[in-house]
Amino acid sequence: MANMKDVKRRIKSVESTMQITKAMQLVASSKMRKAKERAEAVHPFFEGVFQVMADISRDHEFTSVFTKKKFKNSVLLIVIAGDRGLAGGFNTNVLKLAKAKADAITESGGEAVIMAIGKKAVEYFEKREYKLIDGFPQIAEGIELIDAMMIANKVIERFKIGDFDAVELVYTTFVSVMTQEPQHLRILPVENLEYLGQKHPMTIYDPSPEEVFDSLIPEYMGGMLYSAIVDSFASEQAARRTAMESASDNANEMIEKLSLLYNRARQAQITQEITEISSASLNDNS
């Protein structure tokens, strides 16, 4: 027979844990909504930047250091993960993709260089034999556009002097509250812009299309990084919300089972006491 005091203590412990998981679920939901709002707020500006760059890149005579394809001797992987755990497979999935991309670069004879954004990404690559050149833990929740621009300018300067032949991004994109998908994309050299928007043949760029294009690269890079970091943060919160919702449901199910166990133990105890009283009464009468 289960010890009633132990079962009661266990029920209280699980109830306390469920209060925590429900609170974390609510906090994650709130942070997820705010992150989505931040991403949507800057979208029109960056859409305009991309459209101008796309318009310039359609000119067959146009050339820029930021569009020239090179042999990929050295590739910078900017890896964005979370700052905390308790988010299901969020961190594991994006870091698994990043590792696969880094290993593929190495196996093809190139060098994979890592820039990690998020505490989990920094910790992951610090513990492994990868070339980690920079780390930015715990910046995602409060990141401003100026922070993303600062990181972007660091990358741009090193790309211009030839430290990297390509810059690629690994992060998690928000599909829905229930679905978040790890993504990999090339951001430098810039490619495939010619497929965006409409051609504007009467547009004249001063001082030159090349200079205008190159001057927009910091906004382009900053926008890509800012959007990816905010998107990743929203994905992290969605994954945490789902994980905490599942934990709360499991805790509630456990409480129901423990309560049933407690009630059965209590019923058995009462039955035993009645039996003992009845037996004592019969003995007295005899």
From Swiss-Prot:
InterPro entries: ATP_synth_F1_ATPase_gsu, ATP_synth_F1_gsu. It is found in: Cell membrane. It is a peripheral membrane protein. F-type ATPases have 2 components, CF(1) - the catalytic core - and CF(0) - the membrane proton channel. CF(1) has five subunits: alpha(3), beta(3), gamma(1), delta(1), epsilon(1). CF(0) has three main subunits: a, b and c. NCBIfam families: ATPsyn_F1gamma. Produces ATP from ADP in the presence of a proton gradient across the membrane. The gamma chain is believed to be important in regulating ATPase activity and the flow of protons through the CF(0) complex. This is ATP synthase gamma chain. The lineage of its organism: Bacteria, Bacillati, Bacillota, Clostridia, Eubacteriales.
